[in-house]
Amino acid sequence: MNNKNNGMHLEVLINKSISLFNLQYQAFFKKRCVDIIIKNIDNSYVQGKIKQKSETDYYGFYKGDYFDFEAKQTNKNSFLIKQIQPHQLAHLYLIHKNSGFSFLIICFINYNLYFIITFQQLINYYQKTKRKSIPFQWFKDQCIELEIIFPGVINFKKMINDLKLKYYDD
């Protein structure tokens, strides 16, 4: 199975969304770069190695708050928790413990739906159920469903407001 473009749909959607949000609201959200060491260049073929594990996909500031999140997608009826690497969980934990907003955006490709699950929700779910996956219906019932406003743009303003309400309620 070729995983080369795994997550590209969601990444493009988020990149377009944060570009618009940054412009409209003078926010600062950015995709993290992956450090790569280039070993060899042969015509158009570049051979390289990842220097170190990346933390999460995105980070940003808006109105004095810090946000850090990972983007994942699945074509199944559940989200496999093992899709989140241990170093990413550790990073999200540190953000959470330092009063930042740490979360994941999950895309269910088969349903064309997008959700936010906070770090705390993820940990609570796993500690309570010990399950290795989270069913789609749980996301529908428990998580913030993201609204797409323009073709290919998440309503980031609404997402941030909903996330703040969810965080303060948990």
UniProtKB/Swiss-Prot annotation:
Write down any Gene Ontology CC term: cytoplasm
Membership in a protein family: Belongs to the RecU family.
Q: Return the annotated site residues (Transition state stabilizer).
A: K72
Protein known as: Holliday junction resolvase RecU
Transmembrane parts of this sequence: none
Species for this entry: Ureaplasma parvum serovar 3 (strain ATCC 700970)
Q: Which GO terms describe its biological process?
A: chromosome segregation; DNA recombination; DNA repair
Q: Which GO terms describe its molecular function?
A: endonuclease activity; magnesium ion binding; nucleic acid binding
